């Protein structure tokens, strides 16, 4: 981890020593600014039982700029688009240098428990969530079975 800012080293050490329950985040062997992340679908959510792969990258400006995060596993969620980009305020205008990688991962995990169709990135999914939530939840469960189980 030579050449990395001390803050990134400290955050990485803490993530490895004290993992967030339901989340695994490991730095890439060749680039310590790039993390391989796996988030377990939260209990009592349509994503329960799934394991979702994400990539997290710390830009050169971190912590003055937010990490770049995206889902690698397909997910049916109003706040995640087909490319895996995530609509989450702390990844955009609400980012603060006081926040950490850990905070970002916890916020993404919370977004899985509480999709927000009123601030969508995937408009079609959000529309389905608003007009027929039961059907949207069933589709999310089906996608979880299809794409997020036995995928690790």
UniProtKB/Swiss-Prot annotation:
A UniProt-annotated Pfam family: UQ_con
Top-rank taxon, per record: Eukaryota
Q: Which GO terms describe its biological process?
A: DNA repair; protein K63-linked ubiquitination
Q: Name one GO cellular component term.
A: ubiquitin ligase complex
Q: How is it modified after translation?
A: Conjugation to ISG15 impairs formation of the thioester bond with ubiquitin but not interaction with UBE2V2.
The record's keywords, sorted A to Z, are: Acetylation, ATP-binding, DNA damage, DNA repair, Isopeptide bond, Nucleotide-binding, Transferase, Ubl conjugation, Ubl conjugation pathway
Domain UBC core: residue ranges = 3-149
Family the entry assigns: Belongs to the ubiquitin-conjugating enzyme family.
What is this protein identified as?
Ubiquitin-conjugating enzyme E2 N
Q: Which organism is it from?
A: Macaca fascicularis (Crab-eating macaque)
Highest lineage ranks of the organism? Eukaryota, Metazoa, Chordata, Craniata, Vertebrata
Q: Which gene encodes it?
A: UBE2N
């Amino acid at each position: 981890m030579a050449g990395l800012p001390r803050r990134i080293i400290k955050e990485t050490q803490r993530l490895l020593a004290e993992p967030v329950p339901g989340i695994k985040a490991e730095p890439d062997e060749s680039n310590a600014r790039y993390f391989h992340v796996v988030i377990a679908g939260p209990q009592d959510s349509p994503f329960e039982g799934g394991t979702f792969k994400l990539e997290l990258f710390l830009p050169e400006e971190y912590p003055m700029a937010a990490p770049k995060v995206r889902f690698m596993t397909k997910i049916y969620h109003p706040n995640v688009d087909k490319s895996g980009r995530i609509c989450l305020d702390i990844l955009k205008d609400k980012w603060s240098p006081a926040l950490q990688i850990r905070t970002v991962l916890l916020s993404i995990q919370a977004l899985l428990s509480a999709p927000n169709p009123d601030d969508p990135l995937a408009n079609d999914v959000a529309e389905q969530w608003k007009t027929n939530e039961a059907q949207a939840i069933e589709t999310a469960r089906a996608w979880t079975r299809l794409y997020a189980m036995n995928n690790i």
